[in-house]
Structure formats: C-alpha cells, structure tokens
Amino acid sequence: IAAALRLRAKNHNVTLIEKHKDLGGRARVFKKNGFIFDAGPTVITAPHLIKELFDLFNKKSENYINIKPLNTWYRFIFEDGLKFDYSGNEQEMKAQIKKINEDDVAGYENLVNFTKKIFNKGFTELSEVPFNKPFFMMKQFPALLNLKSYKSVYELVSNFIKDEKLRRLLSMHPLLVGGNPFTTTSIYGLILYLEKKWGIHYSMGGTGQIINGMEKLMKEENIEIIKGHEVTNIILNENKITGVRLDNDKEIRADNVICNADPPSVYSKLIESKNLNSFFKW
C-alpha cells in the first residue's frame, strides 16, 4: 500500500493486487463471533511514517485515521502475581525496576543506551538502504559484530540485567514481530529504543482502521485495486519483466512490478527462469 501511494505521488499509473478479499497483509483484520481481531500489529511505534503517506498528497492523516498515544504500553503479570507497567515514563520504569532489583536500575540505563546505538545503525542508517550487493552487506559486518548482533535479544539483555523477570520483560520485543527472544538476533533490540524515541500509539477502532483510511486515499487518488485474486506468475520476456498473470489467467501489463514477498519465494515460484530457480533452491 505504501509503495502504491508513493508511486502514485510520482504520477505513475498504479494497480495494486491483493489475493485476499480485504487489504492490509499483516495489518489486515478478521472477524469471528461478532468480534474483530488484528491479524498482525496492534500498536504503532512510528506514526510519522503513516502520516508521510498522506502528506504526499497534501492531505491530513487525522481526517482518515485516529491514532492516539498511550501512557501505559504493556502490562506484564508474572506467575507469582507481580505486575509491571511498561511505559515511556523513565522515572516510573526505574522505580518499578528498583523494587524488583535495585542493582538493575543502572543496568537498565546502560541497556537503553546500547539499544540506541543499535537503533542508530540498524534503523537510522540502514533501514532505507538496499542489501542487494554482497560487497555492501560485507561492509556492515564489523559494525554489526560490534553491536553484538551474533547474540540473541535475551542474551543481550542478560548482559545488562540480573533479575530473571526483568530479563524476560525487557527482551520481549521480538514477540511483536513473531520472533523468539531466545533465538532472534539482538539487532531487534532496536525496538526497545524505537519505542522510547517515538512512543507507542494505538489506532482507535483497531489497526484495520489505518488500512481503511489508506484504501480511501488510494481510491481518491485513482489507484486501481484488485482484491480476491492472486498473482500466479510474474511475466518475464527476454530477461525483462512485462507484467503479471492472475489466478483467473488475466494478464496485466506493467513497466515495473513491485512485490513485497521474500525474494527466494518470488524468484522460485513466480518467475519462470531456470537460472533463477536453481540459484534459490537452497
């Protein structure tokens, strides 16, 4: 959706294809027994990135979606009944940590400072840089090693925090993206600082309201939206992409195709090329 809006803002004719009957991908919602569930993210950590999409068309995001900052971000309840309210209020955070283990207050401060370094490298410097060349990727290894990316998030937190409960709550961030804190690289520790920097926000009515607002914007800007049809093949003609084929055999011609699925799946399943398919067999 973001790519479609950005391309439309540059005056491209854009067609968005979604295999489900509703938009959103990981941010879509589903309904069951009268209830609405977020299929993916529930909280918003960088609302300015959403606002940017509306700014492209000189429109106010608040006319489409209602995003509110939260005071309490998460509430942890441990097996012994201990409660911990996780927030952006550093005084309250340190006071709660002190009650559990006074020595971990300094460790918490050091952890936040370290995750700031990870954030500056992994988000600020590299989030908009394409990792499409081996040499460029290799250049990042020294910095990533210095930031202890070979450790898991839990291992990184444990370097600073002694108490087991505090270790668990401060290493929970990979869970937000479906990861395991005990195996996910410590680079994901940047989420801890990202939350501190921009806060945690909630879309009133659920994440689906953000998608509804973006869909309304796309329709206003004449982006064609095709729902309920899956792309089965990216058409390759003399080593040039010329369009896509849908599950109803309809072909849509295009000068450029953007796909946000993982590259191995795209190249091995959607593009008919023996050279590409053999490369991605691993």
Where are the model-predicted features located?
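N-terminal glycine-rich phosphate/pyrophosphate-binding loop and immediately adjacent elements
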Residues: 1-117
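Generic, well-ordered alpha-helical scaffold segments in large soluble proteins
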Residues: 10, 156-160, 169-172, 213, ...
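Rossmann-like flavin
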Residues: 79-184
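Residues forming anionic-ligand binding surfaces in small-molecule and nucleic-acid pockets
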Residues: 184-195
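Glycine-rich loop(s) and the adjacent beta-strand/alpha-helix scaffold that form part
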Residues: 200, 204-212, 220-221, 234, ...
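A conserved short coil-to-beta-strand element within the FAD-binding core of flavoproteins
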Residues: 224-242
